[in-house]
Amino acid sequence: ITATNNLPESYNSEPQRATVGAAWAMLGKAYMAAPEETGLRDFAKADECFKTIINMGRYELLNDYADLYRYDNPNTKESLFELQFNNVYPDCNYWEFDCGSRACDSWFGQGCSFSGYDFLVPTPFAYKTVEEGGIWEDGDLRKEEALRYDFTYYTNKYSEDGTFEYVTPDLSKTQWTGTTDELEPHIKKYEDYRTDILSGLGINNMWNSGKNFSMIRYADVLLLHAECLNELGQTSEAVQIVNNQIRTRAWGGNLPEDKKWNSGMSKDEFRDKVMDERLRELCFEGWRRIDLLRTNKFVELIKERNRWAKESGTIQDFHKRYPIPDTEIKTNDAFGPEDQNPGYSK
């Protein structure tokens, strides 16, 4: 609240600084995510925060979803707050290293802009189509911008005469990992072509990825506004916001009739559908865990949709909280082993 009363709308040439728009967004998110037992969860107050942002007239959706992830297009009119990076150490962010394919690294080296080490990979639910049991609908343009499905690369590494050719990798060079998902769809949003040897910029190293990381986008604000309207009994208006703005852009400006949400849907139906829409719009941007926690779907949907959680069977209710770090317990006089969150070793 203090930030909303004191921060400016802009710092002009200092985009790394949080503005009042970002403060209103975070306050609205706090009202929505507050545990119900605290009495602080308040959709009306949250919606006032989001309407304040909308009425500022400062932010709008980009026409093309793909433009959000261009390395040469940071801090757009859709951005309320971005973490700033560049390709020069120590200001690079290693996202490519985390999200890229180890198979591509083994085949093409670290100068391929989608090489990496598979530390962050999407679940099958997040990359499959609805027909395959996943999230993506036919014609949704966000799918190909969010995820890499094709790992074919233009290289001279495997030609006898040094000519460039298109090479599609397989798993033959990564059998030592004992896994088989190195060429399953990967996160594409943070690939930075500047690091690619083919860019001609001389970086040639996936470690130096430097795209900004978007923390709060106007699309997020609109979806939260719609969610609040639904909770406040204005489901039809909420549907129109999602149809006319979020989904229309996702289909390139012309939303087919069969992709329009029914304005007569129930409040419960909208709750479920808007969570899936948030996944399509904001996947890999850091909000999914909080969304699942605040809607009390964390354990249920991870068990249902997360391949690795299914296989391990480890996800439990106590995982809603992180453990208190052992170093904090040992060095902070205010904590003792008995203060560890339930479910974790004391």
Question: Over which residues does each language-model region extend?
Answer:
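Extended, hydrophobic/aromatic-rich amphipathic alpha-helical segments that build helical scaffolds
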Residues: I1-L7, P15-I54, F81, D140, ...
